[in-house]
Amino acid sequence: ALVKAGDAIVLDAGTTMIELARQITHLPLRVITSDLHIALFLSEFKQIEVTIIGGRIDDSSQSCIGDHGRRLLQTIWPDLAFVSCNGWDLEKGITAPTEEKAALKRDLMANARRRILLADSSKYGAWSLFNIAPLASLTDIVTDAHLPDKTREALETLSPQLIIAD
């Protein structure tokens, strides 16, 4: 398991991250998130200390965006940072639809000991306008088994560890 008891982790916004949040409720953790749904859900569990980054609420994702949250993210040193994306690609890296979201996601990962992309294989080969980071800047990529073999082989030559989730 990537997440261990006592870890300080950052969770990006989105439906994939909510699924991850559901898998870690049994662990004592410190969780920092931009996602309002994740913050409210995890706050129900006494062994999990939840911090929401603050800032303006993005109505499309019900998450915090803007400089306020970015400043907090720039001053923390989490064990793990889980980032999601609109698209990911060997050549283009991880991408986001807006400059503001791309910047926030960069800060979310910047100081983490492990930088983990959590992305559905259906988003592979798709990309948005703004680059977040190259895949080589990650320590781990977690995706599902529907990734084509050729893509999987290409990803296994990179420095991030490729993890196929059940």
Segments predicted by a language model, with ranges:
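HTH-adjacent hinge/linker in prokaryotic transcriptional regulators
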Residues: 1-15, 21-26, 30, 36, ...
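Conserved phosphate- and dinucleotide-binding cores of soluble alpha/beta proteins
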Residues: 36-166
